[in-house]
Amino acid sequence: AVLRCYLHAAALDGASMRDVLGWVARPADPAPVRILRAASGAAPGWAEELVAQSAADPRTRDSVWAGVRRAVDALADPRVLEACSPPAEQQFDTAAFLRGGGTLYLLGTTGAQLTVAPLITALVEDLVDAARRQAATMTGGRLDPPLTLLLDEAANIAPIPSLPNLLADGGGSGVTTVCVLQSLAQARARWGPAGADAMWDAATTKVVLGGLAHADDLSRISRLAGDIDDAVHTRSYGPSGPAGSVSPRRLPAMPVERLRTLPVGHAIVLARRTPPVHAVLTPWWAGPHADRIRDTLDRHTAAPESGAETAA
């Protein structure tokens, strides 16, 4: 509630995240309350809510503000704070971005995920919320141009809380989501068992790579792939000579051990109402756009500074 009030006050007053960070560091600062009381567009009751939080029992207040400080930990990095405090003319306009049909790249690293992931997550959630609101004003309730979210390492880089619902109903609003996870266990750890199951069920196309190690998940995928008919040939010998027979049996189309040991570059594709497909994937360096990608990598990969010292 405190951070919500701070962000609302900043938006009303044209303040920056630097100001918000200052309010977080100084709980007694009267500026946000003054803004919430004076601004005509302020949400009713929010000023009083912030006053009540500030006047709470010291132990309770300290606990609340400790949580607020953790929420803005990423802003302690001057580079992150600078990126989140642009001049008014350079601020990111989600509505204009959606209308323009551009591409937004959000990059993160494993080392920075604990601090920066909340910011990336908030940006993605804001983008999705803006897309839903914009879609509601369009014919058929679908966004045009549509929005595609390619969420690689979704559980680490941008673990958006609404992802299970987004996979379930985002397509109806023109929002297509591609979610890449290391395993179903990773999804359960981030969104809980119910959330992970909802995501798995909502995904219209599931692409499974090799290397999974969770036996229950492998069995689940194997059962989804279904069974195939196999013939068992038997031969016996009796007084009348040899005799043969053929009896049918059902075998898993994709046994657990086959799923686990899929070679690199191979995948099992499970799409709704269609049999499983064993696909051989084409890496980008073997695809038709390889030269363009290499050229882009060369132009945008930072080169070592000339004259830099090299440690022996």
Stretches with model-predicted labels:
Residues 1-175, 257-278, 286-288, 292-312:
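P-loop NTPase motor domains
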Residues 75-79, 149-151, 177-182, 239-243, ...:
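N-terminal start-of-chain detector that recognizes signal peptides
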Residues 89-90, 111, 184-186, 214:
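Short acidic loop-to-helix transition motifs that present clustered carboxylates
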Residues 101, 165-168, 187-312:
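P-loop NTPase motor core of the ASCE superfamily
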Residues 106-107, 150, 180-182, 208-210:
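Conserved beta-strand segments of the P-loop GTPase G domain that flank and frequently precede/overlap
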Residues 170-190:
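Sensor-1/coupling segment of RecA-like P-loop NTPase cores
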